[in-house]
Structure formats: structure tokens, C-alpha cells
């Protein structure tokens, strides 16, 4: 595609998902002090009668969901918070034993369990203890397979029609703070925020600092054929931070993405942006160990307690207990899920899920209450951020067919006005199925008070600058700061100053711009755009409907197309190889965009583009005598149409940006660009067609792959190479997902091409199995990028003198080519999650190795924040 297609990127999409994760990391870093270390317990569990080790016994902190299990040799490691004084060891056929623990940070224990006189009787199930675990002839595995076989009839999707009232509450804050931390000078004005915290056992946990709460009340309708769910939001409220500093909508969307709905009947459960294998997935016996640990005859029907543990504690798997009904339905009555301490998961110190099911009028089980607790921390020690999402389901009814009009439109619809004042505390007190805890009740008031304190405003201002790169200045923001200074061979030392308006100036009009100056070429550059929303919403709120006009004069490297990254970013100033072929661009552009609730959108554009070669880039053509004729500028007028369809797409929505959330659904796009000769000074006729698709493929425990497939065709004759498809190259040392990292700028040009890009993330599936290495929590990543194209003779300077000559180096050798008989291919193997945020790839170029000054291999680095 032409080299300027992504030149007019606004800065609204720079950070997106990373911004929300960054906000979380800032709070974690702020709280990271040594005000309470975890207790590390190590020990062995044995049979008191024969001193034989007891494998897969449960070791749990009393009054907590923190638990572990012994290995084949009876050994265990358990990490608990310092306030707990007892642990409980239990195993089927033995009497449970409570052990008191001291305050030492590291403790070793030897525990002897006493066999029960009468082992637990089960209903048609016995659970003899085996020396070594095996799926064969294992009653626990036979039981879980019966649960798997009955999944479809027990899940809510099996109902023809169902409807219920749903209440959601998300709350979080700093937890387990010490008295010393609370009394620090920096918190002198914030004492009203701290709450005394206790656990069920009565042991003091110090102080908590509640920081966020959100509530939502909805009516939900589901039907089986055709499958459809409709959520009508009846009321919602949350603690609001100053919108100058915090994007409340984006923060809410991010927390709701982390604290997702938990469906135990799904094969893969998405949590904290990762997919965990459900203990009742079809493949669960391959990845989990199951044990029958109890029967419960005090409930009707009788229940079996089925304990399960990951075979590999580093994999993305749960551990916990399932309570299965013994009425022939094999439904889940209750479920308690957590994760192992050794799991390859970033920033999550503890994860706890509790699911409770109730029977409906037909004696079938539906989810009654779901609780998800997450404890985030930068390290295993110290305080983190602890949050809980509680969801209750009431007034559950089935068999009531609603008209099609109920299911029409978007799957989630707000039934309340944005500033509805009728949803006051009296309303919530009446409609909440669960009363707020005292510390939760105070959050709404405390956040309002907190924002009146000048020191807190300064802290938020600095945090916003660090995370977004912009400095607040009334109704505008100055930035991004990482573009203030950069350098390149053409401009030399480059200074830039820019900014953008916010919704404090206008919710419908948005402007951004910058000016820059190069001290070597002594030229001014600038960019200015104005966007007006046509649907009385922010221009970045779905569905978008706006008109935008922009003007730009700036430099550009042909073949460097950076999505969502400023090209004068300081870090991108460092490049390998020759890097002196630039363009001066003057672009005037008008755009009209319309999105629909179906996630279909179109973008219409009209642009006038004048480009002048800069540096050592030349535009030259051979005349009839074979002499070079130089061209000092090139002009075109383009009309463009872009179509995009992204079914079931969701966004991290912010004030000045939005970013799509990856899911399993494909994204299709089609772009058409027409060059208009003799229109507004346009000099060429051509038609550029691009068709492509993006999709993420999930492979459960084997990770996931992001795949892009694209085809391009340019129709026209005697088209100079700047208007052909100059393929994306990368001469920086940063690994770029959408570019060819070992291809030089301007190296390959085509007028028809097909390409494929595969990024495969294994989430540590291999490295998690290697002793010692798995302690590093590194993860594997592989990629293959291939592109094949051709260049028709009428557009190839080797066959016609009516187009610009390809570029040559100082020795007169060509450095720009069409493709030969094979595609260009590069592949990489790398490690990600190094220090939790660094990706390093070894990239190898597989062909076209004889072309001058091309790298055959290299190391590339990328920053990637992820859980």
C-alpha cells in the first residue's frame, strides 16, 4: 500500500489497554513496601502408623481460601499471610489435623495423620488410596467423566428460555496495611480512608484502603434457538475519580474485563486476560489429578466432594473442590477454585472463585451466587491490591418466551439516562440483594472527599503524565512527552510540541495538533486535525459517527508504517543500516466515519497529497536518450473507502482513545483507494484494493495464535513506485508485530501480493515443564511472516522508462526490488515475560539473502505488559 496510509494517526490510541494495566501497576508500586511479609511453610505429611508419605493431602490456612497439596512423596510448600495462626491438613480416610504456626517467616513442619476407624462411605463410589496416581480404574476420574458427559444438560444454555435479575458488585483497594504504613507522613491528610480489617477467625489483618466500587443491576433474558442473550441495565453507580486524571469508563471496562463472569461449564474460562482450563472440560483428566475427598449426606441430593489439583502447577490451571450431585444428573452444586503458588501468572498473588448453585422449579441447578477474588501484587511479599466481584442471580424463571423485540439490537443496553438522579441511596438500599459492607459504604463518600485534597490532585496529575504521556492544562493536554525530542539523518536534532483537547472543552468536538522543527534541515513541520461527532457522543465512543478534517506537513520514511505509534518517538530514533531516504509530505484530508451496532463500519476519505524526496531519496526517470530526469515533487488526489466488520467486538473505552479487546471472533476489512488524475492537481490514475482478515485462535493449554491474512491488488499502468505497495519494513531494534523486522526500507515493491502473519504464544507450556527454568516464568513465542507479490511490466522500471527508477546504493547496486519466484519469509523464536514485561526474539531471514546490506538474522526486543 502507499506509504502514507497510516500517516494520519491520532494520538488517541497510543496506550489503551496498557494504560489501564499501567494504572494498576502504579498503585501496586505505590504500595510496595516491606510492611508485612508472607509466611513460607514447608513440610511433609505422613501416616502415623507406618510413616508412609501421604500424597495429595490438602494443606490449607484456617479461615482462608489459601491452600496447597502434597506431592507423591508427601511434601508441601504453602505461603500464607502473617495474620493466620493455623493450618489444616486433611485427606480422605484420615482425621483432619489443625497445626498452630508461629510468626517466623520460614518454617518447616512434619505432620502425622491418624487413620479414621471407619472410612467415608460413598454412594456407589469408593476411593481407595493409590501409591501412584493413574486415570485408569480411578473412581474420581470416572466421576468427573460423568460430570463432563452431563455438562450440556446442566448449563443455562440448555434452557429454551430463561430470565433473571442480576446484581453485580466490584470493589477493590489496598489490603493488609500495617500501622506503620498507615502512619506515614504522606498519609497524614488521608487517615479517613483507612479501615480496620478483620477476618472470620478474628485475627487482625491490619488496615485496608478501599479505593473503588461499582454496582450494577440488570434484567437478563436468554433463549436457546436462536441463541441470544439480552442484558438490560436498570441501574448502576460507581465511585468516580476526577475525569481530568482518570478515565472512569476505561477503568471500569478494564476491571470488568479482569473480573469476568465465571462459567464452570465452559471448557476454557477467561480470567485476567488468560484462558484457564475448566476442571470439567473434556480434556481435564489429562491436565488435572482428581480425588474423592468426602461425601455429604446432610444435603438432598447427596454430594461428593471432588478435590482436584493441576498436574503441572505452573500451567494455567485451577485447584480446588467441586461438589457433585449424586442424583443421576451429576451437576455442580458448589465449586471453590484457586490457583497454585507456582502458576505462570503475572502480578496475581491469589485468585479465589466461589460458585453456588440453586435448584429451580424443575429441580435443575442454576448459578445463584458467583464470587471472584483477586489479589494483585508486584512481588510475593508486601501489600497488593485486593478486589472482589460478587454476582447474584434472583427471580430465576424458565419457559417464558419473550418477543423477538426484546432481543433486538445490542446485547447490552442501558435503560437509564447518563445523569439519572432517581437512583439514589434509597433506591439501592431497597434493590440490593446483599447489603454493602461498612468499608464499601464509605468508598463513595471518601473518594469525593479525597479529590478535594491538593496533594492527592498532584499525585494524580503526575500519575496521568507517566501513564498517558500527556500533561493536563485545563481543557487541553500537552504531549505526548516521548515525542518532544528525537533525531534522524535528515532533520538532525528534532524538537516537537503538541497537544489535544479533552471533553472538558467539548464532548462533540475534538482537536489535536503539533509543531516540530528540525535543526539540520531547518524546516518547520506541523499537524492539525479537527473532529466533530454527528451523534451527540464523544468521537471515540461506540458507535462512532464523525466528520474529520486534517492538514499535515511532516517527514516520512517510505515503507515504515507504524500502527498506533508516533514515528518521531525517541526510542525509534535508533535504527540499523542505511536510513537516509525520507519524504516531505503535505497532506490535506477529509474523512467521514459511520459505525453501526452490528459492528460494521465504513470510512470515506478524500485527500490531496504532495510529496517531495528528502535525504538521498530520488525520484528520477530515464528519458529517450537514457539520461536521468529528476522530479522534485509528486502529486496525487485520492478517494478512499474502508469497510470493516468485527462481529461481537468489544473495546476498552476511554475519553480520548479506545482499543479493541481480543476475542475468538474474526475481523474482516476491505480498503479501496482511487487515484484521481486531473482532480485537485492529481497526476495519476490507479485503483488500490486490499482485502484482509484478523483472528485469534485459542488452543486452551497450548496457548493462542494471532493470525493475519491479507491480499492486495493495484490496477493501473505506469504507476510510480511511491504509489505501489511498499511493503512494511523495520530497521529499528524493536520487534514490530505488523512489519517485516529484517526487511530494509523500500526493499520490496509490488502491485499485487498476498501475505500471512502468525504470532504464536504458548504461555509457557513447554518451559513450565523444565525444572529451574520454570521458576523464571518465561513464556515461549514463535512467529512466521511471509509475503509474495509480483510487479507487472508496465509498472516495472526494468521494462519501461515511463515510471521512476528503483533506488540504488552508493555503489550503483539496486536496493529496491520486485519479488522473484519465491515469497519473502522470516521467522522468529523468542521468550516473553522476561522480568514480566520484556519480549526478546531471535529473528531469522530465510531467503533473499544475496541482496546488498540485508541482515540475515538479529535480536529484537519488545515491551509487552500482560498477566
Describe the residue ranges of each PLM region.
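Structured extracytoplasmic
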Residues: 129-303, 309-317, 379-486, 579, ...
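Short, acidic Ser/Thr/Gly-rich low-complexity loop/linker segments typical of extracellular
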Residues: 65-75
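Short Pro-Gly-centered beta-turn/loop motif in secreted/extracellular proteins
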Residues: 51-55, 77-84
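Exposed, low-structure sequence patches enriched in small/polar residues
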Residues: 274-276, 408-867
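Structural motif
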Residues: 39-54
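A short, solvent-exposed beta-strand micro-motif common in secreted/extracellular proteins
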Residues: 83-93
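Hydrophobic beta-strand segments
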Residues: 57-61, 87, 125, 164, ...
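Short, acidic, small-residue-rich periplasmic hinge/interaction motif at the N-terminus
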Residues: 44-46, 58-60, 91-94, 108-156
Amino acid at each position: 500500500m502507499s506509504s502514507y496510509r497510516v500517516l494520519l494517526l491520532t494520538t488517541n490510541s497510543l496506550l489503551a489497554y496498557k494504560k489501564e494495566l499501567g494504572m494498576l501497576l502504579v498503585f501496586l508500586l505505590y504500595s510496595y513496601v516491606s510492611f508485612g511479609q508472607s509466611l513460607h511453610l514447608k513440610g511433609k505429611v505422613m501416616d502415623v502408623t507406618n510413616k508412609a508419605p501421604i500424597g495429595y493431602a490438602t494443606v490449607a490456612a484456617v479461615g482462608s481460601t489459601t491452600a496447597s497439596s502434597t506431592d507423591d512423596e508427601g511434601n508441601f510448600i504453602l505461603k500464607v499471610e502473617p495474620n493466620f495462626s493455623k493450618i489444616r491438613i486433611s485427606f480422605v480416610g484420615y482425621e483432619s489435623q489443625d497445626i498452630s504456626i508461629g510468626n517466623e517467616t520460614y518454617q518447616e513442619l512434619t505432620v502425622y495423620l491418624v487413620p479414621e476407624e471407619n472410612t467415608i462411605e460413598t454412594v456407589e463410589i469408593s476411593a481407595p488410596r493409590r501409591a501412584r496416581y493413574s486415570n485408569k480404574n480411578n473412581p474420581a476420574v470416572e466421576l468427573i467423566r460423568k460430570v463432563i458427559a452431563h455438562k450440556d444438560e446442566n448449563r443455562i444454555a440448555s434452557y429454551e428460555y430463561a430470565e433473571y435479575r442480576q446484581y453485580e458488585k466490584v470493589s477493590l483497594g489496598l489490603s493488609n496495611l500495617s500501622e506503620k504504613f498507615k502512619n506515614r507522613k504522606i498519609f497524614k491528610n488521608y487517615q479517613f480512608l483507612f479501615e480496620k480489617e478483620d477476618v472470620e477467625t478474628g485475627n487482625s489483618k491490619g488496615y485496608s484502603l478501599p479505593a473503588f466500587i461499582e454496582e450494577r443491576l440488570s434484567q437478563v433474558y436468554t433463549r436457546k434457538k436462536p441463541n441470544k442473550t439480552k442484558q438490560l441495565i436498570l441501574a448502576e453507580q460507581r465511585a468516580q475519580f476526577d475525569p481530568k486524571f482518570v478515565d472512569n469508563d476505561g477503568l471500569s471496562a478494564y476491571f470488568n474485563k479482569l473480573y469476568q463472569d465465571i462459567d464452570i461449564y465452559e471448557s476454557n474460562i477467561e480470567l485476567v486476560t488468560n484462558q484457564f482450563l475448566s476442571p470439567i472440560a473434556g480434556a481435564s483428566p489429562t491436565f488435572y489429578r482428581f480425588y474423592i475427598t468426602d461425601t455429604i449426606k446432610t444435603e438432598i441430593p447427596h454430594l461428593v466432594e471432588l478435590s482436584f489439583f493441576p498436574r503441572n502447577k505452573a500451567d494455567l490451571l485451577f485447584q480446588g473442590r467441586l461438589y457433585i450431585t449424586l442424583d443421576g444428573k451429576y451437576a455442580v452444586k458448589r465449586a471453590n477454585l484457586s490457583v497454585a503458588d507456582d502458576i505462570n501468572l503475572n502480578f496475581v498473588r491469589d485468585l479465589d472463585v466461589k460458585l453456588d448453585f440453586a435448584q429451580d422449579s424443575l429441580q435443575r441447578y442454576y448459578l445463584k451466587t458467583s464470587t471472584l477474588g483477586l489479589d494483585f501484587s508486584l512481588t510475593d511479599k508486601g501489600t497488593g491490591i485486593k478486589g472482589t466481584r460478587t454476582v447474584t442471580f434472583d427471580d430465576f424463571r424458565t419457559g417464558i418466551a419473550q418477543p423477538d423485540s426484546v432481543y433486538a439490537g445490542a446485547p447490552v443496553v442501558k435503560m437509564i439516562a447518563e445523569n439519572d438522579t432517581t437512583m439514589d441511596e434509597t433506591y439501592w438500599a431497597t434493590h440490593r440483594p446483599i447489603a454493602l459492607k461498612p468499608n464499601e459504604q464509605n468508598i463513595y463518600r471518601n473518594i469525593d472527599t479525597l479529590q478535594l485534597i491538593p496533594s492527592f490532585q498532584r499525585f494524580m496529575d503526575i500519575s496521568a503524565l507517566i501513564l498517558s504521556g500527556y500533561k493536563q492544562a485545563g481543557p487541553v493536554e500537552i504531549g505526548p512527552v516521548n515525542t518532544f525530542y528525537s533525531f534522524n539523518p535528515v532533520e538532525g536534532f528534532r524538537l516537537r510540541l503538541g497537544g489535544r483537547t479533552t471533553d472538558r472543552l467539548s464532548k462533540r468536538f475534538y482537536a489535536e495538533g503539533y509543531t516540530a522543527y528540525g535543526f539540520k534541515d531547518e524546516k518547520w513541520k506541523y499537524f492539525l486535525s479537527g473532529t466533530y461527532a454527528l451523534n451527540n457522543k464523544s468521537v471515540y465512543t461506540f458507535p462512532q459517527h464523525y466528520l474529520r478534517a486534517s492538514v499535515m506537513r511532516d517527514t516520512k520514511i517510505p515503507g515504515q508504517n507504524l500502527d498506533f505509534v508516533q514515528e518521531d518517538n525517541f526510542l525509534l530514533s535508533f535504527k540499523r543500516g542505511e536510513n537516509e531516504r525520507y519524504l516531505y509530505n503535505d497532506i490535506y484530508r477529509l474523512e467521514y466515519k459511520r459505525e453501526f451496532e452490528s459492528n460494521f463500519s465504513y470510512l470515506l476519505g478524500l485527500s490531496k497529497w504532495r510529496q517531495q524526496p528528502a535525504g538521498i531519496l530520488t525520484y528520477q526517470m530515464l528519458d529517450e536518450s537514457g539520461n536521468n530526469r529528476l522530479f522534485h515533487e509528486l502529486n496525487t488526489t485520492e478517494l478512499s473507502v474502508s469497510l470493516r466488520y468485527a462481529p461481537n467486538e468489544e473495546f476498552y473505552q476511554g475519553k480520548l482513545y479506545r482499543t479493541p479487546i481480543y476475542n475468538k471472533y474474526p475481523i474482516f476489512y476491505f480498503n479501496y483507494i482511487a487515484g484521481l488524475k486531473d482532480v485537485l492537481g492529481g497526476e495519476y490514475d490507479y485503483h488500490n484494493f486490499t482485502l484482509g482478515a484478523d483472528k485469534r485462535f485459542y488452543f486452551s493449554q497450548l496457548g493462542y495464535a494471532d493470525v493475519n491474512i491479507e491480499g492486495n491488488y493495484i490496477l493501473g499502468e505506469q504507476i510510480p513506485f511511491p504509489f505501489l505497495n511498499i511493503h512494511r519494513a523495520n530497521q529499528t531494534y524493536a520487534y514490530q508485530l505488523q512489519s517485516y523486522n529484517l526487511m530494509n526500507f523500500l526493499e520490496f515493491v509490488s502491485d499485487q501480493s498476498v501475505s500471512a502473519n502468525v504470532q504464536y504464544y504458548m504461555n509457557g507450556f513447554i518451559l513450565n515443564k523444565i525444572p529451574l527454568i520454570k521458576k523464571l516464568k518465561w513464556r515461549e513465542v514463535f512467529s512466521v511472516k511471509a509475503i509474495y507479490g509480483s510487479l507487472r511490466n508496465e509498472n516495472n522500471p526494468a521494462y519501461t522508462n515511463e515510471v521512476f527508477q528503483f533506488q540504488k546504493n552508493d555503489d550503483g547496486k539496486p536496493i529496491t526490488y520486485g519479488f522473484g519466484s519465491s515469497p519473502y519469509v522470516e521467522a522468529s523464536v523468542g521468550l516473553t515475560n522476561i522480568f514480566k514485561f520484556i519480549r526478546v526474539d531471535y529473528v531469522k531471514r530465510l531467503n533473499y539473502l544475496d541482496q546488498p546490506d540485508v541482515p540475515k538474522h538479529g535480536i529484537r526486543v519488545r515491551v509487552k505488559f500482560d498477566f
